[in-house]
Amino acid sequence: MQKFEPKSIRTQVAMEIENRIFSGDLKVGERLPSERELAHELGVSRSLVNLAILDLESIGFLKTIPRQGTFVADYKNEGTPQMLLSLMVNGVSNNTAVELFTSLMETRILLENECAKRAAENATDSDLELLSNLLEQMRAAKEPAQFSEANFRFHRALMSASGNIVYAMIFQSFELVIRYYVSKYFTSTSRMRVSVSQHENLLKALVEHDASKASEAVQIIMHEGITRLNELFGKKRTQRS
């Protein structure tokens, strides 16, 4: 491991441990070196190592067993949305991150598809007005960041329009991960224009209370995103290999 300069040391220590997990140097169920050993190896204080370990515990990478030590957790099955985001941002070149990305998008397709159908049946006038306003914000956006924000809020409003509050909660729990992907996807005005057209079709189906067309429209949106993001991450994996 490298020794760190005194800049965001706590974060850097946590990321170094993450990288050892991603690379397979530390495997699920394996015990970490003691805090004293890690501190000596990294050239930092034990208190900073302890804080970094607590951070990694909170998002599901590590677990501490009293009088036994700290171990790599079964993060695939016991992790959190924050852990998933960390995998995507820092571990996108490994197979686990790709697998998790695919699983996340499959889950989102199921969720958005069901919500689109329910929203076509249950959306109120105020729901449709909000969706229309957010679509107008997407049309008017000049910068990718503005567009990404309006896009995220549109899909969050779609969840609420379904009438199922748990769907909206599930979507919100993945906010950080979804925002990350949305920001990576909308990097050009051409993609923004295509997305506006696709969302116009979705809103039209909702206004017409056509569940079948709403389902079709949202699946087109999701599959387009999956294709483009897979291309992006494929390029990154090639560059890092």
For each of these PLM feature ranges, what is it?
Residues S8, M192-R193:
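Short helix-capping and inter-helix turn/linker motifs at the boundaries of alpha-helical repeat units
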Residues T64, K76-Q82, A145-A150, D210-K213:
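An N-terminal domain-start capping segment
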